[in-house]
């Protein structure tokens, strides 16, 4: 037991374990991409490879869960809930589209070029949030997109004359994965709001099993229509062995990504993902002995600089968003407390028209701090808070035909908190008392908003 705890401490809490997990993640990702390119050099089957990748991940996840339950006494395959199916089904569509177009791009252009184009995902993310959701980014974020875009353009300048279709496939794949990240978060939030708040949790292997399994099932008709059994390699052939290696490495790549994301922060994970992309580009260039000129090398270097600057800007934005969330949380608690105080305030039997408007009746606000904040409001400095009985008509809505509430004439400082504004409801007309002077609230405490 002590040895197991020590091993767990080394693997998940110390820098050595973190670096080891990152290195394994990088290697598995590089093996997946290089074996994919090797398979496409022998047999162009992008749909079949994507289909088998989902199947391998689901199969190996199920095997690991059964082995864990049988020999280690851990959690086995859990029954899927509506929440899991609701979230994995739409996301599987994005997964299928992104992987298929990525495989199509790999069949036509080098792996390094595909991943260089995929490095444009921050650019598409910022543009989507800016124009679709009106999100405002910092100047540092926009500045980081300049070397990123310029670097990708330089790195792909040679491929523009070679195969423009492959670059187009890579761009489509990048846009699909960006859409998955944007709408996937909204799908998760909507699913949580409609969930039954069950306490059932799913481990990483179960999540991999259901996400890949749903994508595998959904892709069956697409695979049968596009390629089918004719593109399956013979058992024992080099392509068949590469498919096995590709499926294993793809499974380890996914499980290592889940593990890293669960033990480090999102910002640290994004930096590790940046290094992984650069690692895959360098390994693919060395593995396939790809000729790279000075322009392409400079483009890859500028792309790495742009990604690093973008991650630094995200770290600053994350800090600002945390402060905003803390402020919103405090404001929400204050609003709930205000509503409770209003409901518990003793009433005279007639409900005030300001009930539910977050104005505390025991505090009389200054009009110069309230009226400018109310858009399309009929209230003016000459229409509320007075000790006079003269009234002026203001349009309003009222359910009773005739309701009257008298106002007290004694406005001493001893009963300042018991004052009520006189009002009269007469057939959809709200009449407020006229003040004796322009501002009748100099001695009243200011309402802080």
From Swiss-Prot:
Keywords: Membrane, Phosphoprotein, Transmembrane, Transmembrane helix, Transport. GO terms for molecular function: antiporter activity; phosphoenolpyruvate transmembrane transporter activity; triose-phosphate transmembrane transporter activity. Residues 382-416 are annotated as: Disordered. Its main location: membrane. The keyword Transmembrane helix applies. The modification Phosphoserine is found at residues 348, 352. It is found in: Membrane. This is Putative transporter C83.11. It comes from Schizosaccharomyces pombe (strain 972 / ATCC 24843). The lineage of its organism: Eukaryota, Fungi, Dikarya, Ascomycota, Taphrinomycotina.
């Amino acid at each position: 037991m002590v040895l197991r705890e020590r091993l767990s401490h080394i693997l998940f809490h110390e820098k050595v374990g973190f670096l080891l997990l990152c290195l394994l993640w990088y290697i598995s990702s590089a093996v997946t991409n290089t074996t994919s390119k090797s398979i496409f050099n022998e047999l162009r089957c992008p749909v079949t490879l994507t289909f088998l990748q989902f199947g391998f991940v689901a199969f190996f996840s199920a095997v690991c869960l059964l082995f864990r339950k049988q020999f280690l006494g851990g959690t086995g395959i859990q029954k899927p809930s509506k929440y899991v199916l609701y979230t994995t089904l739409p996301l599987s569509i994005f997964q299928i589209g992104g992987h298929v177009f990525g495989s199509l791009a790999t069949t036509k252009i080098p792996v390094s070029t595909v991943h260089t184009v995929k490095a444009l995902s921050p650019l598409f993310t910022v543009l989507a949030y800016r124009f679709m959701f009106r999100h405002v980014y910092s100047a540092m974020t926009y500045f980081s997109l300049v070397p990123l875009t310029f670097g990708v353009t330089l790195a792909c300048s040679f491929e523009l004359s070679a195969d423009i279709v492959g670059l187009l496939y890579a761009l489509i794949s990048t846009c699909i994965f960006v859409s998955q990240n944007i709408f996937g978060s909204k799908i998760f939030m909507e699913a949580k709001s409609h969930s039954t708040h069950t306490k059932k949790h799913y481990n990483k292997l179960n999540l991999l099993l259901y996400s890949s399994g749903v994508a595998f099932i959904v892709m069956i008709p697409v695979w049968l229509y596009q390629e089918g059994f004719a593109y399956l390699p013979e058992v024992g052939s080099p392509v068949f062995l590469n498919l096995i290696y590709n499926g294993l490495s793809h499974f380890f790549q996914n499980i290592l990504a889940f593990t890293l994301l669960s033990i480090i922060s999102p910002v640290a994970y994004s930096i590790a993902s940046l290094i992984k992309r650069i690692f895959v580009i360098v390994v693919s260039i060395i593995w396939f002995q790809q000729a790279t000129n000075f322009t392409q090398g400079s483009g890859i270097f500028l792309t790495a600089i742009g990604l690093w600057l973008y991650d630094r800007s995200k770290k600053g934005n994350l800090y600002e968003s945390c402060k905003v969330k803390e402020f919103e949380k405090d404001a929400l608690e204050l609003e709930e407390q205000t509503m409770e105080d209003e409901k518990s305030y003793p009433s005279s039997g007639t409900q005030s028209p300001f009930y539910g408007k977050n104005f505390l009746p025991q505090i009389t606000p200054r009009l110069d701090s309230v009226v400018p904040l109310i858009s399309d409001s009929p209230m003016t400095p000459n229409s509320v808070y007075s000790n006079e009985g003269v009234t002026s008509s203001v349009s309003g809505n009222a359910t009773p035909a005739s309701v009257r509430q008298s106002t007290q004439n004694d406005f001493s400082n001893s009963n300042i908190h018991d004052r009520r504004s006189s009002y009269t409801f007469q057939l959809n007309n709200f009449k407020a008392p006229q003040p004796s002077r322009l501002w009748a609230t100099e001695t009243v405490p200011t309402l802080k908003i």
